[in-house]
């Protein structure tokens, strides 16, 4: 099944962006080629932009504290797997402590580093990081891969508490939902939400159908419409019945 996810609010949208960027960063920083490490570094700049939103850190701390207060009363409950509960609570408490230790504006260390700032300003220009534009950066790219990787990891480290917090919140949100099998009649599906508030919608479709879900929602109803794309033409609405799995997630 192919999984598509649709955020219902700006906070979850931001966390999904961070997750995608950190996954890309993790992949490219693990590689050996200098060009792949260039992608890792420019991705780190993107992470800093997204994570630098003024209220992100406080939002994450409030949500983690709310989850901690929700889960803590289940300690000692015989109907709850205590080892799993303690693992989650320990992870939340450690991440809260790490967030509390973050000082200053998120990503400020990348701005204050004049050398990185020069790379960042050139990286937004097409072809702007050629060896004649940034000879010192080109020289750094000739260093052994392990040394480059060590440097990039050092620059990323101050942002890791935000990554850990975002991953916990997204994981708890995803685990809150229960998948149901539904059918989009002639490619279209609607469902009343009865005023319930959800943070995330997941749509899983069989890959062999080669359809693409487009979703929208308000506090009363959600819509899923399926389209198909062939080659380089625009996606078009399908008129076949599409079986899929729908999951609504509510922290």
Curated annotation (Swiss-Prot):
Gene Ontology BP term (one): FtsZ-dependent cytokinesis
Q: Does the keyword Magnesium apply?
A: no
Q: What are the protein's UniProt keywords?
A: Cell cycle, Cell division, Cytoplasm, Septation
The primary site where this protein sits is: cytoplasm
Q: Which GO terms describe its cellular component?
A: cell division site; cytoplasm
Q: Where in the cell is it found?
A: Cytoplasm
| InterPro entries the UniProt entry points to | ZapD, ZapD_C, ZapD_sf
Q: Which SUPFAM superfamilies match?
A: YacF-like (SSF160950)
Known partners and oligomeric status = Interacts with FtsZ.
Give the function comment from the record. Answer: Cell division factor that enhances FtsZ-ring assembly. Directly interacts with FtsZ and promotes bundling of FtsZ protofilaments, with a reduction in FtsZ GTPase activity.
Q: Which family does it belong to?
A: Belongs to the ZapD family.
Xref: NCBIfam families:
PRK05287.1-4
Q: What is this protein called?
A: Cell division protein ZapD
Classification from the root reads: Bacteria, Pseudomonadati, Pseudomonadota, Betaproteobacteria, Burkholderiales
What is the primary gene name for this protein?
zapD
């Amino acid at each position: 099944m192919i999984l598509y996810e649709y955020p219902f609010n700006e906070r979850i949208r931001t966390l999904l962006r961070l997750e995608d960027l950190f996954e890309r960063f993790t992949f490219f920083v693990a590689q050996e080629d200098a060009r792949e490490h260039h992608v890792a570094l420019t991705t780190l700049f993107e992470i800093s932009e997204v994570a630098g939103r003024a209220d992100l850190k406080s939002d994450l701390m409030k949500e983690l504290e709310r989850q901690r207060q929700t889960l803590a009363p289940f300690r000692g409950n015989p109907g709850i797997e205590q080892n799993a509960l303690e693992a989650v609570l320990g992870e939340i408490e450690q991440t809260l402590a790490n967030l509390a230790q973050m000082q200053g504006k998120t990503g400020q260390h990348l701005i204050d580093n004049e050398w990185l700032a020069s790379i960042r300003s050139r990286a937004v220009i097409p072809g702007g990081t050629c060896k004649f534009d940034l000879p010192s950066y080109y020289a750094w790219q000739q260093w052994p891969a392990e040394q480059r990787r060590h440097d990039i990891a050092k620059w990323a480290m101050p942002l890791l508490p935000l990554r850990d917090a975002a991953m916990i919140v997204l994981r708890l949100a995803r685990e809150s939902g229960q998948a149901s099998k539904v059918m989009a009649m002639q490619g279209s599906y609607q469902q009343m939400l009865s005023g319930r508030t959800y943070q995330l919608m997941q749509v899983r479709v069989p890959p062999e159908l080669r359809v693409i879900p487009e979703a929208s929602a308000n506090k009363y109803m959600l819509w899923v419409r399926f389209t198909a794309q062939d080659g380089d033409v625009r996606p078009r609405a399908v008129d076949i019945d599409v079986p899929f799995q729908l999951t609504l997630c509510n922290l």
